[in-house]
Amino acid sequence: MTGPSGAGRSTAINVLEDLGFEAIDNLPMGLLMRLLDGPALRRPLALGLDARNRDFSTEGFLDLSKRLASLEGFQVTTLYLDCSADILLRRFSETRRRHPMSPGSSPLEGVEHELELLRPIREAADTLIDTTALNVHQLRREVERWFAPSGGSMLAISVESFSYKRGLPRGLDMVFDCRFLANPHWQPDLRAADGRDPAVAAYVHADPQYLPFFTRVTDLLQSLLPAFRSEGKAHLSVGFGCTGGQHRSVALTEAVAKALAEAGGQVSIRHREMERRKPDARPD
């Protein structure tokens, strides 16, 4: 990926990283082949190449693109982020930054010089995204349209259980209180188990208030996910809390995470208190 300074390359590389790419920005061209000679890639690779780097040249970029395309086992796409000169000037003016190619000359001369330098790459690129009329959110959606798996934005969802006695975990976007549900702690045969145990989960699910609560929560989350994706949100963190963080919140976390995963979500689970729990600790 390349493009003129101010066209949005840093934003685009961050979007690709959110989509699961291994993203490296400002990589000197001379290091690229050495990078590929290293350990096998486990994820798609996104590389941002900057015309300001001292080893950058148009000819070198085009030659490198051809060499990469000829490698067996690699599918290579060249992405060029374009933008009109007047908008690039406006963006640099708004940020009060000097154009990197205009030391001792006018900003317009720097912008025009860089656009002319990159013109052959623009003409040879596989994919061109014109950011002239795009804001950050629109650019994110455009990059996702081209490069997201199955054509959709990836939104990572983490679902976490916790104990209110130990405070709310940091970084939660949404919190649900489970303390109104029947507490397995008061059942001697369930006290030592946790919410992943089928007997504990069945006890929690048998509470008449459980199903309406579970249904409303999952309906709410599933109705909001498209809006979060549309806004370019990369991660959603949802927490379920109960008194001790061992029974009710764990059972809800497991059930909600399963429902979201079955609906196509990229879901991870964390049970905070169980990570902290000592062998002699008492669940709620």
Curated annotation (Swiss-Prot):
- Where do the annotations place ATP binding? G3, P4, S5, G6, A7, G8, R9, S10
Q: Which HAMAP family match?
A: RapZ_like (MF_00636)
What GO molecular function annotation could you give as one example from this UniProt entry? GTP binding
Q: Which NCBIfam families does the record match to this protein?
A: PRK05416.1
> Coiled coil where?
none
UniProt keyword annotation of Transmembrane helix present: no
Function summary: Displays ATPase and GTPase activities.
Question: InterPro entries, alphabetically?
Answer: P-loop_NTPase (IPR027417), RapZ-like (IPR005337), RapZ-like_N (IPR053930), RapZ_C (IPR053931)
Q: Know the name of this protein? A: Nucleotide-binding protein SPO0713
